[in-house]
Amino acid sequence: MSTIVLVTGGFDPIHSGHISYFKNAKELYPHTPLCVGLNSDDWLIRKKGKFFLPMKERRAIVKELKPVDLTITYDDTDNSSNMAIYKCLQMLSLIHI
């Protein structure tokens, strides 16, 4: 069975603590793909009442970080967090439809 590391959050705005989070995850599992799940703008509005950076911007920044192998986006109002994991596995070709 293949393994992935999935870390999730709003990352709005991205800061040094988030980067340490990604680095630490990658250091713990250096040969395992690191997938970062970003919460949607709607999720951030529900949680904080607003968002600072749109999801497209947050994703563009996060995907350029060295420890990150893959980014996915999701909205946690339903089972979409489960779908986010599924999508990540699919993108890494670990499961097939």
Where do the protein language model's features map onto the residues?
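Nucleotidyltransferase catalytic core that binds NTPs
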Residues: 1-95
